[in-house]
Structure formats: structure tokens, C-alpha cells
């Protein structure tokens, strides 16, 4: 069984802006400022637990694509029931931690829907020392590739990984699965808490299907110009 993947038709559809903002009011303002430039948004924990789930439904009902970044991980039954309800919300993408049983449960629960399930491989904020600290025997690159194979075999629609690993991941998963890359930073920008970062153009060249960009856009003084500059860089790849 294969979960639905997603094929972007334009560069604009390949840019996902992370609404990493504390309130729905601020997120609404960001969406207004980006109207006509951005058509795909990510909503994660910060906004989700401040009324962002209702906001996600509202945006989705109007045709905006929403990537719900929940990184689900629990026993199979709990993951499946969560996915079943998220399917009803009309979301475009949903993240599941790349544990085989959780992924298989999610794929079964999303069967027949348009929800693209993304396997979270290794957080882009983690480096090799972080992996050692939490007890993994693999370095980030090796674990990303292992989990990419597991996601493919589980029938997931895509994989979330650093753009630094996107080229190797693409070779494993083939041309049809989504390869979604956070940790994107324009050349010369602050890396923040991200450790494995890549520029927008390099991410596209490495085989990423979608780029997730938050702070470089939502924290910019001119969000619209910041988003347009990243789109222009993506087009130059």
C-alpha cells in the first residue's frame, strides 16, 4: 500500500512557509502579507496549540495547502486514530516519526485520502554529538538513509530530511516520493538553532521537492520581499 504523494506544479507550490508564530492573529497577518506569493503553509506545535488547528481548517477550506507538522509517534492504534481525524481536516501533508510500525499504521489510516504522509528522519537541529547523546549508534546521514528505506517500504508519501541529505535520499526513494527539506537558509542569513542547513538553490539542485522556510520569511521586516527572494533563488537552481 502506498500513501498519496504530492507533485508540485510550480516553484511557488514548492515553497512551504512555516507559520512559527505565537498567535493566530499574527499568523493571519503573515498570510495576508504573503497572499499571492505563497500558497502553502506549515503549522506546527507553537501555533497548533494556540488555536492554530481551527486556523488550519479555515485555510484549507479556502484552498490553501497546509502541512500539519505534528510528528506523530505512539502505539499503532493511537497513531491511526489521530491520522483518521486529521484526514477529515483536509490537510495536505502530515508528519509521522519514521518508526516502521507507526508509519504502517498511518498509511493504513490514510488509505483512499489525499493526505500526504511524511516520515521525519532526523531533525535538522541534530548533529552527530546529539545522536550520541540520545543513544543512537548511527551518525545523522546514515540514520536518514536507513529511515528513508523504511519509509519507502512502509508506503509513505514522502520523507523529511536535511537538504544536505536530499540527493542521497532521492536516490533511495526514487522520483515520485516527496522530499521535504527544512533548515533552509538564504546565503548569509543566521542559522538560528539549525545545524545542517542548505541554501534554497542548493536544496532544489539536491533533489528536494518542497522547501520549508520559517524565520527567514516570517521574521523579516518585509515578508513578501523575503519570500519572493527565496522563490527567485529556487528558480535559479
UniProtKB/Swiss-Prot annotation:
Listed pathway(s): Pyrimidine metabolism; UMP biosynthesis via de novo pathway; UMP from orotate: step 2/2
Active site (catalytic residues): 71 (proton donor)
UniProt xrefs under Pfam families: OMPdecase (PF00215)
GO process terms (BP): 'de novo' pyrimidine nucleobase biosynthetic process; 'de novo' UMP biosynthetic process
Enzyme class name: lyase
Amino acids binding substrate: 20, 42, 69-78, 124, 185, 194, 215
The EC number(s) this enzyme carries: 4.1.1.23
InterPro entries: Aldolase_TIM (IPR013785), OMPdecase (IPR014732), OMPdecase_AS (IPR018089), OMPdecase_bac (IPR047596), OMPdeCOase_dom (IPR001754), RibuloseP-bd_barrel (IPR011060)
GO molecular function: orotidine-5'-phosphate decarboxylase activity
Catalysed reactions listed for this entry: orotidine 5'-phosphate + H(+) = UMP + CO2
Keyword Lyase applies: yes
Assigned keywords, A-Z: Decarboxylase, Lyase, Pyrimidine biosynthesis
GO CC annotation: cytosol
Role of this protein: Catalyzes the decarboxylation of orotidine 5'-monophosphate (OMP) to uridine 5'-monophosphate (UMP).
Assembly information from the UniProt record: Homodimer.
NCBIfam families registered for this protein in UniProt: PRK00230.1, pyrF
Family affiliation: Belongs to the OMP decarboxylase family. Type 1 subfamily.
Full protein name: Orotidine 5'-phosphate decarboxylase
UniProt gene name: pyrF
